[in-house]
């Protein structure tokens, strides 16, 4: 019996990605500020930008969670209570923390602020979850390493007031719940403070120290090995099982990914969750949704640990992404008099290029443009310049933010 429709929680690395997540159906977003952020490589939000993000999110009836889940040093620990008080005053709906001391201090300093336990904390059992709830946690984000049977038991044995969130889509880490020292050891950039260089994705070869330059055969592609390179998680076919287990929130990984990735994954999981909720006992993920999540940059997909230890959870062929589709442009408006879509270019494309139109909350259409126009209303054969405005004949308006997508040859 599912008591409540699970939340679709999407990443928001910047304002553009925030708008994409909200527009394409996320119930909530998570993002980082300039402090305590596990994605130091992303742009992050200043305090002013954060206040605007909260305002926009609440105007759309959605929720916003702020990440505060790095490993803090002493100076940062002194700053945290005041920072949390400031963001609570802004209207942030919850803070995501990973350190038990931070949890306790935050609960004392701002008792009204909802606190979520990050996957970095490695919550794997009901006892830990229950004790974290006793210390002030409203929600726990479970470790990615848990099978469905363990999730079911954990949900059954924790207090009913404690919510459970799980990752359903995105990159996975070779270390337990992302706690890794490889990046710091090899490059000096600490993954536990948001600066991971992802050495698990690098190319490796075996060499004996007294024979420099002589490589030994452990390679998969004739040159190197990718033995640390995990596949990407995709659980869109199993949302019913997670909901029945007691999961309250379906989380999508990817704050450093593109706005296109954010839009497509949020839209796909929105549609799948709605479909599952209408009839949980007979949920079957449609083919078009399974295909939709393959049209973003991704590695080979896996169900991770959901059904036990993964058999082949690594990508041995390459450390890179699979990219079969890219964004040609984004719809910004409509010229009703001339019946033209107003758009902004994202990648070069031309007249006659078959497109897919990805509409917020309205599925996907196909279209092949026969006429394109530049910003001066002059007919053009192609749109070659990044971020250039252009127009395209189309019989009706499309929602702002609709994506024009094309296959990569």
Write out the residue ranges for each language-model feature.
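Short beta-strand elements of ligand-binding domains
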Residues: 66-67, 97, 117-119
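Phosphodiester-processing cores and adjacent nucleic acid-binding clamps
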Residues: 51, 64, 83, 97-98
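Alpha-helix capping/helix-boundary segments
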Residues: 17, 101-102
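Surface-exposed amphipathic alpha-helical tracts and adjacent flexible/coil segments at the periphery
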Residues: 1-23, 28-31, 35, 54, ...
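Gly/Gly-Pro- and Ser/Thr-rich, intrinsically disordered tail segments characteristic of DNA damage-repair
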Residues: 78, 112-124
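Short active-site loop/helix that positions an aromatic residue
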Residues: 104-107
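Glycine-rich, positively charged N-terminal anion/phosphate-binding segment
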Residues: 39-56
